Swiss-Prot record:
PANTHER family assigned to the protein according to its UniProt record, in alphabetical order: IMIDAZOLE GLYCEROL PHOSPHATE SYNTHASE SUBUNIT HISH (PTHR42701:SF1)
Organism listed in the record: Parasynechococcus marenigrum (strain WH8102)
Entry's Gene Ontology BP terms: L-histidine biosynthetic process
Record's protein name: Imidazole glycerol phosphate synthase subunit HisH 1
Subunit structure: Heterodimer of HisH and HisF.
High-level lineage: Bacteria, Bacillati, Cyanobacteriota, Cyanophyceae, Synechococcales
Function: IGPS catalyzes the conversion of PRFAR and glutamine to IGP, AICAR and glutamate. The HisH subunit provides the glutamine amidotransferase activity that produces the ammonia necessary to HisF for the synthesis of IGP and AICAR.
Amino acid sequence: MSKIAIVDYGMCNLWSIKSAIQFIGYDSILTSDPKDILNSSAIILPGVGSFKTGMDNLLSLGLSQAIIDACMFRSIPILGICLGFQLLCCSSEEPSYTKGLSLLPIQIVPLCRHIDASFVLPHVGFTSVYTSKNDPLFKNIANKSDFYFVHSYGAFNVPHDFTTYSYCNYDAKIISSANVNHIMGVQFHPEKSQTNGLILLDNFLSFSNV
């Protein structure tokens, strides 16, 4: 039976994600068991808060290796949301240099490094997202649709050969999402992004064949 695993590592209110998934017609489980991750059909890694705390929690629960093995050796699709997206990346400087899961070749840095002091940080609220053609996450979503953000750290660059990513403009171009095959991440919160967010979640789960 197909199983959607929402990773519970103590970093956010998971019920908003679970409720959104239920609203669009899917069942899911909240889990901190590595076996559930490895035996799932799709993984959702949400999160709010400190990158270092998030990685420490994943490591202490045995979830970091389970996520890597599930994605790299079993090709299980994963969607990282907000902090979850950042944890999929190579590293973050929050609060100091910390290694991530290294499933996406991206570095996370403070927004204030590239954004003028006249702009309010953290970046909070609905912001238009500029999408790539043929991105499965944004199927049936118009380019420059609004999604809900809340973050103080983010990515400003992706590798030159990346063809599937999106960005928003908040004084500087901030990476809003990035995909490498079945490994996907979004900086915004789809569960707080109204209809567009629900469509995006449905797109991910349809891509995952759950």
